[in-house]
């Protein structure tokens, strides 16, 4: 299969294929934090994230959520449908952690009911600033109807993901989603992994995600491996 590099992001490299309708997303071992200011490498990181994303995409698809996922070509190469990415990061917060506790008088660990949903402008140049509907409309990055659909889809993903992870002893304080347009519909894109979610151990509250790297909380490799063991135990058999 043809592999023509389209672009390389912080953690994945995207390639064109012989099929104009599909792309290859290669999950790399790169680690970044603070908008790329902190960088590192972790052996098997791309493998764990790819396999976690695959399993979660399959679960969501089985529950009626459309995604860009097609299949795995290798352990780290995901075949995906090409979509027109909407330049909005949709963040869903179930438990207060991270920036919300620094910007607002909300203590870490506070249960957020209903979940807090936030839009950020997907732009490294501008530091991913928070959006409201009016700014998104002014930027021309989505219609009012699309913004409503993004909210609906993100909350549906949350409804499915929280109990799915809870059964595996994982709490989901918050996570980031990206969506794209395809054939007149909005579908889930990017990845759902230790890079895009906060995962806490249900018993201990310990971080099992990129915060371990971001804030030097311990062994990042063990954290990602533990999440993979709980979500995709079959890859360790």
Curated annotation (Swiss-Prot):
Q: Fetch the InterPro entries from UniProt.
A: SAICAR_synt/ADE2_N, SAICAR_synt_PurC, SAICAR_synth, SAICAR_synthetase, SAICAR_synthetase_CS
Keywords (A to Z) from UniProt: ATP-binding, Ligase, Nucleotide-binding, Purine biosynthesis
Listed under catalytic activity are:
5-amino-1-(5-phospho-D-ribosyl)imidazole-4-carboxylate + L-aspartate + ATP = (2S)-2-[5-amino-1-(5-phospho-beta-D-ribosyl)imidazole-4-carboxamido]succinate + ADP + phosphate + 2 H(+)
Q: In which pathway does it act?
A: Purine metabolism; IMP biosynthesis via de novo pathway; 5-amino-1-(5-phospho-D-ribosyl)imidazole-4-carboxamide from 5-amino-1-(5-phospho-D-ribosyl)imidazole-4-carboxylate: step 1/2
List, alphabetically, the PANTHER family matched: MULTIFUNCTIONAL PROTEIN ADE2 (PTHR43599), SI:DKEY-6E2.2 (PTHR43599:SF3)
Family indicated by similarity? Belongs to the SAICAR synthetase family.
Protein name in UniProt: Phosphoribosylaminoimidazole-succinocarboxamide synthase
Q: Which organism is it from?
A: Methanosarcina mazei (strain ATCC BAA-159 / DSM 3647 / Goe1 / Go1 / JCM 11833 / OCM 88) (Methanosarcina frisia)
